[in-house]
């Protein structure tokens, strides 16, 4: 039955939808009817449709309004419809269908080797981590870099800083390296393979920013289908989601300068962090554009709570 419906959708769409606006409207309707799950770069059917259709047609994501009335060829309509059906039937993330994602206003190549960029840390980068950074940073570490989006966004925000982009996954580092080259930042952003801090020389940074795996087992068991296309290595973090965060907290002070700060995302696992370590003075950051579960600690605060995480030190 599904194959028959797909054939009907394809024939109907290719024959009756003529303009870009028609295609967007039809796609939004199909997405709404399919009860898709969003959250991988968009939070609604309209933005999801736009981010699927425009790259599929090799158009920029910010096309002027008059382009919406442009007519599409039958081959263009067919290409879009095939991707819409794949998004619905397979629950494949749009970014994996187009190999494009956006973060901090920058475009990135992505595929199933990395998570789709979506961290609220982007808002902090655009605000240059004010008021937390007291001096212009010269060394920044992006730990668990994935696609390299945070490292590259930091390099754009702080053009005088060197940025080390760390990940354990060779696949992820290959994607990050492609993005570094695409943005012309080979002399500023440096991909490095390491299991968190374990394989790194002990150098000091003004800022360590990290979006590590933090999904607890309960949430892993109930992940929407869309998120199951993403690499589990970038999501799962043990029963309480803090497996990697504890190691980061244990080792970060050794890699921070005197006035350095750690910014770490733990998402929904912030509940476990607050329950297990109520005495630690986490600064839980707030976001105007949505998001939660990101804390900040200074080097001094990390040193003060070192005993809590001594067991997890490399």
Swiss-Prot record:
Annotated signal sequence range:
none
Entry EC number(s):
2.1.1.298
Disulfide bonding pattern of the chain: none
Pfam families annotated for this entry?
Answer: MTS
List the InterPro entries hit by this protein, alphabetically.
DNA_methylase_N6_adenine_CS (IPR002052), HemK-like (IPR004556), Ribosome_uL3_MTase (IPR017127), SAM-dependent_MTases_sf (IPR029063), Small_mtfrase_dom (IPR007848)
GO terms, molecular function: nucleic acid binding; protein-glutamine N-methyltransferase activity
- Reaction catalyzed: L-glutaminyl-[ribosomal protein uL3] + S-adenosyl-L-methionine = N(5)-methyl-L-glutaminyl-[ribosomal protein uL3] + S-adenosyl-L-homocysteine + H(+)
Q: For this UniProt entry, what's an example GO CC term?
A: cytosol
Q: Which UniProt keywords apply?
A: Methyltransferase, S-adenosyl-L-methionine, Transferase
Uppermost EC category: transferase
What's the domain of life for this entry? Bacteria
A Gene Ontology biological process in which this protein takes part is: methylation
* SUPFAM superfamilies noted in UniProt: S-adenosyl-L-methionine-dependent methyltransferases
The entry's family comment says: Belongs to the protein N5-glutamine methyltransferase family. PrmB subfamily.
* Function, in words: Methylates large ribosomal subunit protein uL3 on a specific glutamine residue.
Task: From the Swiss-Prot or TrEMBL record, give the protein name.
Answer: Ribosomal protein uL3 glutamine methyltransferase
Q: What organism does the record attribute this protein to?
A: Vibrio cholerae serotype O1 (strain ATCC 39315 / El Tor Inaba N16961)
Q: What is the lineage of its organism?
A: Bacteria, Pseudomonadati, Pseudomonadota, Gammaproteobacteria, Vibrionales
Gene encoding it?
prmB
